[in-house]
Every structure is written in structure tokens, then in C-alpha cells.
């Protein structure tokens, strides 16, 4: 007597079924994927020759998110922008007045966010409210207590410079060599994750008076009175968002 069992009709049909293939995820385009996102826009601010930055004792404050209205890559296309990243590349060169003395100084560069600029860029002393007795020591400066709701330090970087009482064109005696010093330094920083949102007025220029909320300043101050000039460029990576 055979002990094998006959397959039921539905069992036989089930075993013959071919499993359905799942659609490839590569063929599906997700909403909001990187392919759908607009690429970052780039604005480059160059400072060289007649446009070099002069950094006096007490510092200098410049607006850097200067996105004028337009259709080019460096222009804002809408009434709102988001600045994500910044690259800073400069040569700091001690000026002739500073080179007359043997000196060292610790300078500072800040990126400062201004919630309500009010039509004009502030001075470093407005932001940090330092007394005149601390004018030469920027590493000690802090945002004014009364204005901490307005000014926010996004980044802060230190750098060191030196002078030895000589200028670059001086020539040592034939039997002497002079030790090099940091009268000319290269300063590079790249920072991301800034998330600076700027709301613009209904005007076409990119000055501080065109900003309703969210100005971004680059503040530079020399240490110990070692004044200098800055030669190079700042590159900003941003997007135009919001309404036209």
C-alpha cells in the first residue's frame, strides 16, 4: 500500500506561483530627494588692490551677505535667503606703522549675526561695548549685555602676528641673517551649518539698508595695536528661498 500523499489542487497551484518582483528602489524618485533640491548659490567677495581691507586698532565691521536682487548665481532670486557655508582666504600683512616696532599680537575674526540691522552696519565697539582701555585686546571682547538679543556670534577665530622693527624691503648686512617673523600670514577658515536666514525689503540692492532681518558681518580686529591690511576673498554658499 502506497504511503505517499497526493497533492491537493490548491497546493500544486501554490507551488507553481512565481513570486512577484518588487520594483527597484533605484527607479523610484522620492519627493524631496537630493536630485530635486536646487544647488547652492555662490557669492564671492574679493578684496585686493584698491579694495583691500584696512584693519585699524579697534577693528573693522563689514557686511558680507550682500546679495543684490537679480538672476545671476550670486544674486538673490527671492525675498529671503539662507546662508549655509562660508570660506575665508586672506593674507594679513602688517602695515608700515606696525612694522616700526618689535611686537606680537593676537587678533580675532568673528562672524556676527544681526537680527535687526536698522539700516546701517554697526562698529565693533557697538557690538562688543569694549572700553577704550581694552581697544588693543580684542580676545577679551564680549557682546554687549544690552544688545545680546540683537547680536549673535556665529564663529570666532584667533590668529597671531609678529613684527621685528623691520619692513620687508630692509636688507640685512652680508654677514648677518634675520630670523623670519609672522608679519605676513595666511588665514584660511571654512565653516558650515551657519543657517543664517535673511529677509529682504522690496528693493534691488544688497546693502545693509536692504535687509529687514538677518545681516551677517565679518568683524576683524588686530591684537596689541599690530595693525594690518587684508588681501583675499570671502566665498558664501547660500540659497534663495521663500516667495518671489
Curated annotation (Swiss-Prot):
- Keywords (A to Z) from UniProt: Capsid protein, DNA-binding, Host nucleus, T=1 icosahedral capsid protein, Viral penetration into host nucleus, Virion, Virus entry into host cell
Q: What highest taxon heads this organism's lineage? A: Viruses
User: Position of motif Bipartite nuclear localization signal?
Assistant: 1-24
Q: Where's it mainly located?
A: virion
Q: Does the keyword DNA-binding apply?
A: yes
Q: Where in the cell is it found?
A: Virion; Host nucleus
Positions the record marks as coiled coil are: none
User: A Pfam family this protein belongs to?
Assistant: Gemini_coat
Question: Which InterPro entries does this one have?
Answer: Gemcoat_MSV, GV_A/BR1_coat, Viral_coat
Annotated stretches, region: Disordered: 1-39
Task: Supply one GO BP term.
Answer: viral penetration into host nucleus
What protein name does the entry list? Capsid protein
Q: What species is given as this protein's source? A: Maize streak virus genotype A (isolate South Africa) (MSV)
Species classification: Viruses, Monodnaviria, Shotokuvirae, Cressdnaviricota, Repensiviricetes
Amino acid at each position: 500500500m502506497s504511503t505517499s500523499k497526493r497533492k491537493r489542487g490548491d497546493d500544486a497551484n501554490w507551488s507553481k506561483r512565481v513570486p512577484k518582483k518588487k520594483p527597484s528602489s533605484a527607479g523610484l524618485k522620492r519627493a524631496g530627494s537630493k536630485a530635486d533640491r536646487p544647488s547652492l548659490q555662490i557669492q564671492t567677495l574679493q578684496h585686493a588692490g584698491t579694495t583691500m581691507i584696512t584693519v585699524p586698532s579697534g577693528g573693522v565691521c563689514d557686511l558680507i551677505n550682500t546679495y543684490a536682487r537679480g538672476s545671476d548665481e550670486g544674486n538673490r532670486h527671492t525675498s529671503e535667503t539662507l546662508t549655509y557655508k562660508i570660506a575665508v582666504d586672506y593674507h594679513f600683512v602688517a602695515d608700515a606703522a606696525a612694522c616700526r616696532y618689535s611686537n606680537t599680537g593676537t587678533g580675532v575674526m568673528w562672524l556676527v549675526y544681526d537680527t535687526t540691522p536698522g539700516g546701517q552696519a554697526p562698529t565693533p565697539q557697538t557690538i562688543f561695548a569694549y572700553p577704550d582701555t581694552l581697544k588693543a585686546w580684542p580676545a577679551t571682547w564680549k557682546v554687549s549685555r544690552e544688545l545680546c538679543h540683537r547680536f549673535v556670534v556665529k564663529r570666532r577665530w584667533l590668529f597671531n602676528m609678529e613684527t621685528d622693527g623691520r619692513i620687508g624691503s630692509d636688507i640685512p648686512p652680508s654677514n648677518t641673517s634675520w630670523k623670519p617673523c609672522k608679519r605676513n600670514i595666511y588665514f584660511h577658515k571654512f565653516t558650515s551649518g551657519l543657517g543664517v536666514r535673511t529677509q529682504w525689503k522690496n528693493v534691488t540692492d544688497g546693502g545693509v539698508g536692504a535687509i529687514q532681518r538677518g545681516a551677517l558681518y565679518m568683524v576683524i580686529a588686530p591684537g596689541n595695536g599690530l595693525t594690518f591690511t587684508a588681501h583675499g576673498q570671502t566665498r558664501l554658499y547660500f540659497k534663495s528661498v521663500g516667495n518671489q
